[in-house]
Amino acid sequence: MQLEKMITEGSNAASAEIDRVSTLEMCRIINDEDKTVPLAVERVLPDIAAAIDVIHAQVSGGGRLIYLGAGTSGRLGILDASECPPTYGVKPGLVVGLIAGGEYAIQHAVEGAEDSREGGVNDLKNIGLTAQDVVVGIAASGRTPYVIAGLEYARQLGCRTVGISCNPGSAVSTTAEFAITPIVGAEVVTGSSRMKAGTAQKLVLNMLSTGLMIKSGKVFGNLMVDVVATNEKLHVRQVNIVKNATGCNAEQAETALIACERNCKTAIVMVLKNLDAAEAKKRLDQHGGFIRQVLDKE
């Protein structure tokens, strides 16, 4: 796909005079364009849902969720991956973010890294990619060689693959088994795909990881019941989670949390079923960690 023909490289008429307007009008123009992004994502919700189901199936079978991108796209994948362990209590290696150019590229531009097909393949080899894993290639343009080569390699291994881009019919979309293509249109600053395209990618990644965690029993109601209390704020959040899930008071919630080494799920089952920590944990284990199943089936 030629660069000048890509939607993400087009000229936006709404911002054609943005360098001549007041600061407030500048902000309004950007904000008006940003409002279109959730609508673009809404149009691809069936594609996102299909990807979530595949990701969940693979992760349930022992696989991992691997994000692969360059520049802003790579950083967004790393951001999403890094938030999963503290929010949902999963092991750090379950959701992995890879960026062209390696760790240095998280904060710095690495010239030519996104053009390296070998880099995409080698980064996946270095983490021991297997057929159980799901690789999600992220590229606003849909033409990034690092991502395309990584997706091709993943498919050769038998991995399920997802391609996220903002240009229809892109190489990333056609290479991946599942394509998620929110069309956000031309950027306020021509070609600056860190803006609307980046926002769309972030919204999609939010759904992929959150959907995976909900389907994995990491959410009860709308509560993050596997949150790890790594600071004072999260200690308080744990107490509030147990309170909200059970209707108990703060003292009862804290007592239950202390008894089960601050595991929210166990504390919730303890309170709701009037069990000690060991029995509550046993019942959760019997039902794969799903609070809802413990409550509904016993």
Curated annotation (Swiss-Prot):
Pathway: Amino-sugar metabolism; 1,6-anhydro-N-acetylmuramate degradation; Amino-sugar metabolism; N-acetylmuramate degradation; Cell wall biogenesis; peptidoglycan recycling. PROSITE patterns: GCKR, SIS. It comes from the Bacteria. Induction: Induced by MurNAc 6-phosphate that releases the repressor MurR from the DNA. Repressed by MurR in the absence of MurNAc 6-phosphate. Keywords: Carbohydrate metabolism, Lyase. The keyword Hydrolase does not apply. NCBIfam families: N-acetylmuramic acid 6-phosphate etherase, PRK05441.1, PRK12570.1. This is N-acetylmuramic acid 6-phosphate etherase. It comes from Escherichia coli O7:K1 (strain IAI39 / ExPEC).
